[in-house]
């Protein structure tokens, strides 16, 4: 039965409310949380529909209110959600706006709701937000993004058995062991994206993940500090390296299944061992201007499609 909505010019049919609930929830999942909640005033069928949306995205800009703080908004809406499971939780806030214990509680609730995708984005000019160490343990999490001023402190091996995708974007690391403990606790990790700037608490970034298939490293270090990478990924098929000043400190120890490699925005390649490890690659893309090789590459051209 089609419902009708009256306005000053006549009668309009309410076709949207006749759509299947699953489709309506999919549409609502694409909207900011603030807009999703406002749909509750449309009509009676919409009154509680927003509580069933399985994705919650809280950005600072879209969740400001004169009556409630960011923390109060997140807590209220997270506890009001009645979806069978939580597909995605995105928390974006400014440093000092939320306490670590609050964020830990929200993520703990999401873990209890079997969340699959978690994004934590912290904006700061003062310091780094400490991601609660106890939250590196979740059976259902499939995708994790830690972005900007987040301190990664993993004193013991993590337990993220279902994690398939991990993005570490300009975060801090307390110790070298934090990287090892995090990655070693992801036995099914397939896609790893690492963005690094001048925050160089880790001198050698070791990536030893047997299940890894895709790896992207973007290093925006201006060259003042020396950073190193060691890659041990026997299942790796796709590799992208972007932004290095000089590829002298990237060692690929084990990547026999590598099919495609892309090297971009690199000033020069001065480490012959790097190309020696790429002999199994079917396609090598070099986006270097100007291209400067400190050695002959004649020994490798027969294996590569340039």
Curated annotation (Swiss-Prot):
Domain of life of the source: Eukaryota
Pfam families assigned: F-box, LRR_At5g56370
Statement: the UniProt record of this protein carries the keyword Mitochondrion: no
Ranges: LRR repeats: 67-93, 98-122, 138-170, 171-196, 215-243, 263-288
Boundaries of every F-box domain copy: 13-73
PROSITE patterns for the chain: FBOX (PS50181)
InterPro entries for this protein: F-box-like_dom_sf, F-box_AtFBL13-like, F-box_dom, FBL13/AtMIF1-like, LRR_dom_sf, LRR_FXL15/At3g58940/PEG3-like
Keyword terms: Leucine-rich repeat, Repeat
Protein name per its UniProtKB record: F-box/LRR-repeat protein At3g26922
Organism of origin: Arabidopsis thaliana
Lineage: Eukaryota, Viridiplantae, Streptophyta, Embryophyta, Tracheophyta
